[in-house]
């Protein structure tokens, strides 16, 4: 499975640096000098490999220099490009109750009372914490519920069973 670790926002300056929106929990490791990332152009076209020459933090994003990208025009051509890695390349997580987003996406969600809520469509990362975007199309009318990914609400996660159990406070599931 492919995981997006960054997206090129725009060129920065005239020497070929790019501004990258971070989409990984470990940007220092992913964008370390010498690393090679797969780049998927936003406008179609073939994937290419990009070697990181340098990366530094800048306003919550990264300024990245890639091998072979030496001017603003070449950097501008990368706008919208996604940097991806294969999920098989990710290290195992040793911390309990810690997951990669792709492990949670697709899991079924139900309440402790057995009521089906839907399936995790996406994990949203906000300043206040993570939210599970849970979608359900069972009744013909699609609905989405945002569930805070906190231990007070998420009581159990079973990757083996493909299930997340929640104990929602009153009103959380009401539309």
Swiss-Prot record:
Keywords: Chaperone, Cytoplasm, Ribosome biogenesis, rRNA processing. It is found in: Cytoplasm. Its main location: cytoplasm. The keyword rRNA processing applies. It comes from the Bacteria. InterPro entries: PRC_barrel-like_sf, PRC_RimM, RimM, RimM_N, RimM_N_sf, Transl_B-barrel_sf. One of its GO terms (molecular function) is ribosome binding. It holds the Pfam family RimM. GO terms for cellular component: cytoplasm; ribosome. One of its GO terms (biological process) is ribosomal small subunit biogenesis. Residues 96-172 form the PRC barrel domain. Binds ribosomal protein uS19. The PRC barrel domain binds ribosomal protein uS19. An accessory protein needed during the final step in the assembly of 30S ribosomal subunit, possibly for assembly of the head region. Essential for efficient processing of 16S rRNA. May be needed both before and after RbfA during the maturation of 16S rRNA. It has affinity for free ribosomal 30S subunits but not for 70S ribosomes. Belongs to the RimM family. This is Ribosome maturation factor RimM. It comes from Mycobacterium avium (strain 104).
